[in-house]
């Protein structure tokens, strides 16, 4: 047990404190300010002020905490004169702060020295630095009324005073009136510094496109009005545009920032890497990685973790592993990022190997780790291993399962066809299943064509998810595959009556420094004629190779030929054709889709990978699919 741990155990035990003190003086900790401060706390709490003062006098280095602790000890134990003397010494050395003032005032009041307390309080009000600290303390704690009261009563205010209030209101700007107050204060400021401007940018960026107040348009106006911007200003804009879903503008700001000679910091890089990850912009991510290396930040653990996450989410688990292997230091976040990456790519056994390696290296898994490994088991169909891990999480690590863990287990059992077991798992949960769990169960019903259970799950989902188009689409697909066209029509009418619109499928593909987007039957692209011609050519080749369109989930009761035509020009097919036209032979094609890839597009892509000899990596809303030589890494199980 360390000395720091031993000291608190001796509270109230005078001999124990003396023994610890004597031991400290014989070790390398005899000049350690933190250790000695801890001992000083114990002496003052036990009211051993003679020993506390002796320790205080013998300390070679004293910080503000040391002085405040000695002052507080005297004040709380009725030694107002000694407390005042310490206070005067602090004043001479510039050590006093809001804690010093408060401790002295409380001590004087408790000892019946009301006049002296009022005099000190008057002096305190004249010290703008201390009053600023008091405003800031209230604001950080969310006590905005108290902060405003202190602020209003200040005779002298500087830019720090105003900033403290603006930061307080902006930090609580999820409430419209709070951010309005921040804006009003900002407008009243005669002198603004970079902190003032950055606070407003950060507040607007956090709000995004809120209808209540604030937006990235407002943030841009504030940003454009700044005479001097620093790295925090630029980073706030990047983060705001990223959160707002405007990746193009975020990348533009990042590029402009560098052109103006502003060196990105760790937070900037993490923010832009998250954007690359969310948009699967692998080439952009690699360029950012190169800039990180030039800046000498590749050894930063937070940046390393963001790089692992970015590469995994961009479809390059190989690059993610390379970054992970080169990290000088790894924490549980590092391991979680690589484990989750392998899980998303359907490489369950690799994820489990990493999980075991993590433990061998002395790191304990946390709640997020288990979400990753349970998801890995689900994607890989490792039912037995998943059940073992769930039990281990509860019994070996005392981690209470969350809705995410239960969702993984329902997904695991459901994908494996154990639908009754999955439903039983839901019913035995210690809390009511939310929409995500019933959605996982509905997805399993689709995979295994269980109309009865799907109908049951959908009814439960639609009690709360009346505007969730995905539920209607899933149910409609299940009915269509079973040939229940009357039920398909009922679902369609229900969507129409409730004003629910299906999110249109969209697929993105990165080429050079540009990202190209496609929708179903999209003819807006400049290369549209070439893309459609290439798609027709590929269609003939794969039909010769044995491809048969999968029309089961076409939700229209029409002729089979019309169903096949409806499948021809899905967004992912257009993106793949574009990639084949524009990328050198043998180059992997990477696409990202906002929805789950349909069964026909999945089959189509397997055949394309075979006849072209290309690897095609597709990220949909569920997972990654690696198509190679006519096979998919998901094993047709998604």
Predicted regions and their residues:
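Terminal (and in a subset, N-terminal) low-complexity or junction segments at the ends
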Residues: 1-638
């Amino acid at each position: 047990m360390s000395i720091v741990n031993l000291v608190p155990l001796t509270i109230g035990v005078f001999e124990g404190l003396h023994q610890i003190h004597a031991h400290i003086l014989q070790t390398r900790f005899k000049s350690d300010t933190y250790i000695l401060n801890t001992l000083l706390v114990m002496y003052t709490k036990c009211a051993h002020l003679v020993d506390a003062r002796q320790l205080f006098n013998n300390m070679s280095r004293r910080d503000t905490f040391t002085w405040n602790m000695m002052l507080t000890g005297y004040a709380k134990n009725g030694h107002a004169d000694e407390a005042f003397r310490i206070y005067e010494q602090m004043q001479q050395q510039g050590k006093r702060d809001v804690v010093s003032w408060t401790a002295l005032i409380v001590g004087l009041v408790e000892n019946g020295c009301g006049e002296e307390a009022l005099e000190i309080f008057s002096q305190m009000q004249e010290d703008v630095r201390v009053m600023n600290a008091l405003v800031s303390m209230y604001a950080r704690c969310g006590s905005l009324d108290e902060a405003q009261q202190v602020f209003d009563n200040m005779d002298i205010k500087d830019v720090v005073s105003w900033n403290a209030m603006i930061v307080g209101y902006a930090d609580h700007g999820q409430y419209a009136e709070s951010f309005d107050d921040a804006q009003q204060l900002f407008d009243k400021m005669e002198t603004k510094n970079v902190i003032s401007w950055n606070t407003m940018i950060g507040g607007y960026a956090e709000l995004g496109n809120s209808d209540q107040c604030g937006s990235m348009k407002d943030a841009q106006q504030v940003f454009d009005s700044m005479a001097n911007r620093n790295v925090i200003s630029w980073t706030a804009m990047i983060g705001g545009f990223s959160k707002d879903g405007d990746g193009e503008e975020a990348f533009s700001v990042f590029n402009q920032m560098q052109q103006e000679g502003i060196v990105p910091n760790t937070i900037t890089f993490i923010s832009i890497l998250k954007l690359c990850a969310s948009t699967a912009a692998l080439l952009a991510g690699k360029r950012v990685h190169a800039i990180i290396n030039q800046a000498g930040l590749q050894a930063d653990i937070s940046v390393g973790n963001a790089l692992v996450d970015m590469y995994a989410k961009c479809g390059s688990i190989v690059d993610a592993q390379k970054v992970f292997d080169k990290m000088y230091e790894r924490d549980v976040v590092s391991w979680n990022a690589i484990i989750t990456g392998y899980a998303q790519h359907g490489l369950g056994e690799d994820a489990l190997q990493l999980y075991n390696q993590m433990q061998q290296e002395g790191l304990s898994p946390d709640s997020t780790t288990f979400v990753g490994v349970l998801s890995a088991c689900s994607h890989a169909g490792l039912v037995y291993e998943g059940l073992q891990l769930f039990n281990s999480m509860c019994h070996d690590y005392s981690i209470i399962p969350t809705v995410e863990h239960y969702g993984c287990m329902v997904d695991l059992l459901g994908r494996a066809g154990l639908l009754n077991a999955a439903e039983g798992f839901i019913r035995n949960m210690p809390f009511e299943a939310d929409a995500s769990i019933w959605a996982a169960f509905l997805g399993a019903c689709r995979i295994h064509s269980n109309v009865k259970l799907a109908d049951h799950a959908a009814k439960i989902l639609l009690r709360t998810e009346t505007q969730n188009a995905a539920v209607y689409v899933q149910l409609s697909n299940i009915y269509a595959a079973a040939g229940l066209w009357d039920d398909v029509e009922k679902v369609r009418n229900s969507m129409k009556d409730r004003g629910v619109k299906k999110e249109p499928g969209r697929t993105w593909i990165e080429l050079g420094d540009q990202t190209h987007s496609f929708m179903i039957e999209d003819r807006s692209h400049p290369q549209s004629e070439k893309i459609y011609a290439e798609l027709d050519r590929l269609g003939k080749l794969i039909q010769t190779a044995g491809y048969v369109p999968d029309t089961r989930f076409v939700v229209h009761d029409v002729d089979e030929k019309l169903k096949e035509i409806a499948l021809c020009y899905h967004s992912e097919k257009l993106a793949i054709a574009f990639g084949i036209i524009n990328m050198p032979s043998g180059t992997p094609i990477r696409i990202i889709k906002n929805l789950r890839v349909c069964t026909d597009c999945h089959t189509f892509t397997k055949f394309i990978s075979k006849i072209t000899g290309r690897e095609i990596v597709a990220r949909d809303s569920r997972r990654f699919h690696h198509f190679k030589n006519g096979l998919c890494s998901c094993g047709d199980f998604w």
